[in-house]
Amino acid sequence: MEYKFIEALPPLLYDTFVKKHKHCHLLQSAGWGEVKSNWTPYLTALENEEGDIVAAGLVLARSFPLGQSMWYLPKGPVLDYENHAVRDAYLKGLIAFAEKKRVTLVKIDPPIVRRSLMLEDYPGTTDPRAQEQIEALEALGYIHQGLSLDLESTIQPRFSAITYNTADFYEQLPKRTKRFIRDTENRFVTVSREGREGLEDFAFLIRQTEENKDITLRDQAYFEAIWDAFGDDTYLYMARIDVVYALEQMQQQLAEVNQKLEDLPPNTPKKRRQLVIQQESYQKQIDFFNERLAEEGQHQIVAGALGVEYGHVFELLYAGRNTVWGRIPAQDSIYVMSMQEAFERGMTSVSTGGVPGTLDDGLTKFKASFSPHFVETIGELDYPVKPLIYRGLVTAINLRNKLARR
């Protein structure tokens, strides 16, 4: 069969194909090309003899000094990798297009799964077909960049936490997660979906997270760009607290405990100890809430998360929390609510993003709270369109990225 490589597919046709594909991913959407304003997007595709689209790829192009440039396909291209004719035709067409544009290197990040397991089932075994795909891509001239475990070696993480839609999603959550949700409710925190007007408060939470973890994330303008690109498919969840209402409820609870202590018979020391512990806990919380009320007023932000629905998947992109409310585990409530609502809308899965491949850090432990599979893909492959200067450009890019992380 003959195939035709398409250098510029209209966005509507492009998204129609990608949204229905089993390898659908937000980072391969036409909208993501709009969000990445410091890259030039190309919506490429492959067409068969009947005129049907059989492969697609969002190419992000970036220029460097001395006329050099890189193309990058995050989590792409989108195609059936078991159909070798389609795979090879698209990837060869991509390189021909890159040569035409005088690109230095092309970097792909195929959604080929090497391993997909619950945390407790790791390391398990890898899919032998993944290695076969690597070898087939290498035969086309692509250079595999290895199976790195850290987050810094690749542009997008090789390991992602993905929770799948099941009928018993909530029942299968760890007891710890359910306890944290109850704890958040008992602290009178409310979680709800908000509109675009909540982005300013969300950006505040992200700044708090950046300062607390000494990392650089994104600013409000970037979140606005996401909203511009995806509109009603953008979901912002915020956890807030009415401190005055919370104080009223806790003072009432404390009064009830005090009354129980007064009414308690003298020969019940065990029950008295339990009530005294409750009394001290309520008083400690009341003191803290009074401090917060004096400093920040009645209505305060606790935590938030921003996600986007694309095709049949929901991607939780960013999350942050107010460090002064760090004792309230509101993020668990936000994540679970966003997942439940996504599944009710028919989403097949929710991704909470990348984790280190060692699977032994705090980020992995947190994301494991939502019963995900930790999905490992084969990672990046480079095609040196200009072999003589390819290594020099890669070295320069890596050095720049290393300096940017300091």
Where on the chain are the PLM-derived regions?
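Active-site/acyl-donor-binding loops of N-acyltransferases
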Residues: E7-A8, L119-D168, E344-R406
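Catalytic phosphate/metal-binding cores of nucleic-acid and nucleotide-processing enzymes, i.e., regions
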Residues: Y72
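A conserved beta-strand-loop-helix scaffold within acyl/acetyltransferase catalytic domains
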Residues: I6-E50, V54-G67, R115, E120, ...
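Conserved acetyl-CoA-binding loop-helix of GNAT-fold acetyltransferases
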Residues: H84-A96, R327-Q340
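Conserved GNAT acetyl-CoA-binding A-motif
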Residues: E99-L119, F343-G354
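Short, contiguous acidic/charged loop-to-helix segments that flank catalytic cores in large enzymes
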Residues: G320-P329, G354-T358
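The substrate-binding groove and active-site-proximal loops of carbohydrate-active enzymes
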Residues: K75-N83, Y122-P123
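Acidic-and-aromatic substrate-binding clefts and catalytic sites of carbohydrate-active enzymes
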Residues: L79-A85, P356-D360
